């Protein structure tokens, strides 16, 4: 790994439809092979489906879902005296969002619905209701952190 300076974080521009940076980041997560237009269509169609299904603003449902997905604690491996310990640590805000989006998109891709927009819409609605695979991933992460609470004093 290079020991040079860390590359500066690039600013993400808000998307044109919802004027939200987190929606832009979702589009970037959904995007495959650089096809941003296709990814944007999938996300916007999913948001339309959410609006039709719930009757409320899709962005509010999405933000509720993200709050339910984003982890507060995670475990990191720490080597102490020849053995590895899973040490629970708090998750930084930027990483919380990144993990939440990653888990949401991965859970959507693993679903059985026919189109990606349907999978994404259903996963967002499930997450907003505190169900679904992405919320389960968060619960598992928190459970691991709780189980390894005894090693919290190894935090760095």
UniProtKB/Swiss-Prot annotation:
This is Small ribosomal subunit protein uS7. Part of the 30S ribosomal subunit. Contacts proteins S9 and S11. The keyword Ribosomal protein applies. Pfam families: Ribosomal_S7. Disulfide bonds: none annotated. The keyword Acetylation does not apply. The gene is rpsG. GO terms for biological process: translation. GO terms for molecular function: rRNA binding; structural constituent of ribosome; tRNA binding. It comes from the Bacteria. Keywords: Ribonucleoprotein, Ribosomal protein, RNA-binding, rRNA-binding, tRNA-binding. InterPro entries: Ribosomal_uS7, Ribosomal_uS7_bac/org-type, Ribosomal_uS7_CS, Ribosomal_uS7_dom, Ribosomal_uS7_dom_sf. NCBIfam families: rpsG_bact. One of the primary rRNA binding proteins, it binds directly to 16S rRNA where it nucleates assembly of the head domain of the 30S subunit. Is located at the subunit interface close to the decoding center, probably blocks exit of the E-site tRNA. GO terms for cellular component: small ribosomal subunit. Belongs to the universal ribosomal protein uS7 family. It comes from Streptococcus agalactiae serotype V (strain ATCC BAA-611 / 2603 V/R).
């Amino acid at each position: 790994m290079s020991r040079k300076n860390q590359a500066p974080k690039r600013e993400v521009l808000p998307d044109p439809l919802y004027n939200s940076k987190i929606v832009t980041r979702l589009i970037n997560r959904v995007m495959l092979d650089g096809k941003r237009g296709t990814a944007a269509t999938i996300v916007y169609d999913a948001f339309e489906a959410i609006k039709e299904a719930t009757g409320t603003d899709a962005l509010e449902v999405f933000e509720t879902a993200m709050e339910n997905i984003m982890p507060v604690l995670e475990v990191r491996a720490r080597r102490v005296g020849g053995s590895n310990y899973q040490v629970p640590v708090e998750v930084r805000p930027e990483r919380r969002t990144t993990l939440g989006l990653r888990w949401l998109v991965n859970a959507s891709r693993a679903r059985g619905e026919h189109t990606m927009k349907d999978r994404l819409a259903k996963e967002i609605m499930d997450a907003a209701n505190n169900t679904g695979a992405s919320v389960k991933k968060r619960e598992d992460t928190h459970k691991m952190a709780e189980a390894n609470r005894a090693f919290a004093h190894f935090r760095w």
